[in-house]
Amino acid sequence: MRQILIAGNWKMNCTVEEAETFFKHFKLQKKEGVEMLICPPFTDLPLTNFFLARTSVRWGAQNVYPEEKGAFTGEISPAMLKGLGCSYVICGHSERREILGESDEFIARKVKTVKEHGMTPILCVGETAEERKNGQTEERIASEIRSALWGIDKKDVGSLVIAYEPIWAIGSGAAATAEDAEAVCAFIRETVKDIAGKKAASDIRILYGGSVKSENIADFLKEKDIDGALIGGASLKPEDFLSIYEKAGK
């Protein structure tokens, strides 16, 4: 039985002062079978560690550089993230692919180094509106998955997380329908099966991301291949994020 994962990606939001206010109003009632994760900016990780260390909530990072140390100005290593208590690291988010030009090869290195350091990569995949219109969704997503998993042992693939985030839905307010999201997530599971076998496909958790909120989370989680959500804007207010978590546990 795959555990539901409700993950918040704060992106470049929340100063330390704003994060402190968030956590002071963040009162989680743990629900069985549902895991909560918060991925704040790097600057908020020490504070996040302080507030969440004695709770069931996990925390992670939005990025990593795939080297141990060195002359990589402005970057952060997997060991540094591990030292701050991170359990997860987001890899391959479309904003980093598009704005910062991260390649499939570079993302694969991140996925590999995160796994090697005992953390769980959340691999983001998704298609543009044009690719969707042209019927290229499966081609794009299969390519991203195969590239990202090249350095991962087949026996370890099932412990990863893949987040399907259609680029056209991120921050737009227009989520994919639950049925459309399920069709793509089912394809992702089949792709994982082709790469790493039936057990990996059965074990791997697949999230949907893109304008998820408390009003639609239950619809997504009714689908058999959707195991949670990667949430942006709705994770920035404790009452909104907690509402999503509550509905995920029903």
Q: Where are the regions that the model predicts?
A:
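Active-site loop-to-helix "anion-binding N-cap" substructures in soluble metabolic enzymes
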Residues: 1-250
